[in-house]
Amino acid sequence: MFETLTKAPGDKILALMGEYAADPRPTKIDLGVGVYKDEAGVTPIMSAVKKAEQRILAQGKTKTYLGIAGNKGFGAAVLDLVLGDTLDRSRVRIAQAPGGTGSLWVLMQLVNRARPGATIWVSDPTWPNHNPIAENSGLVVKTYPYFDAETRGVRFEEMLATLDGLGKDDVVLLHGCCHNPTGANLTNAQWDQVAASLAKTGALPFIDLAYLGFGDGLAADAYGTLKVVSAVPEALIAFSGSKNFGLYRERIGAAILIARDAAQADITQSQLLNIIRGSYSQPPDHGAEIIRTILEDAELR
């Protein structure tokens, strides 16, 4: 059977990690994979994470399954962190996923189940893994103008003109903050216009929230996300805890859906959980319990 296969292309970002490790020059700088490092080139474990882990080990009583949606305390804490009291929670559902990538995967599967072969619009450029995840989910990928290499800013007028021409069967993937890979971010005023455009056209906003807190702080970085989800009846958010909690190898993320009303939220969540059950079945708990412990404790937070 396997003789029909050809070698798949390697991941360019991960390949850079190997090249960096093999480079003997002392002045080298790693601009590859998005991992926080200190001045010594080490990705440290946060003190709050260590304290949370100690508490978990001391108080843990079971290793039984969590359920398809994952750690409920984690889910509630993440919704408080990301959305605050912005929305009526009866419209919101959340499911734990293995990292931000896992969140993107299950949510794109959900989109394709709702609108088979839908078009998802991504920024030019975007995180390299967005496209294969979308394509492997059955979606059609197109790009909207974004980065201006000369000014190192956003081609906002062109971006907005493209968004204004979309319709209710289109999905728009937005970087909630800290645009990867360009670092060129929308201003609050530009986010206001994007939100108004999405509300007008009915296109579905899909927000990748991988770096919350790494730009101008938690509240400032959440502005665009909150503005958009407050303006539209439906939205999706892929949250990652890898960066802001330093839990890269724990693979902890969350898939958040916002529906028109509670009844539609229940239906949509049932489909999301069905997708999860047919893929990784249930998520691991350790990273989720770390984040829950930190967010529920004022001292650790």
Task: Kindly label every feature range from the protein language model.
Residues 1-66, 84, 278, 284:
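N-terminal "arm"/small-domain region of PLP-dependent enzymes with the aminotransferase-like
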Residues 32, 175, 239:
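Short beta-strand segments
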Residues 54-55, 61-199, 212-214, 223, ...:
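Conserved core of the PLP fold type I
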Residues 77, 230-301:
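Conserved core segment of the aminotransferase class I/II
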Residues 200-203, 233:
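A short helix->loop->beta-strand "cap" motif at the edges of active sites that frequently abuts
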Residues 209:
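Walker B catalytic acidic pair
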Residues 212-226, 274-281:
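Alpha-helical subdomain
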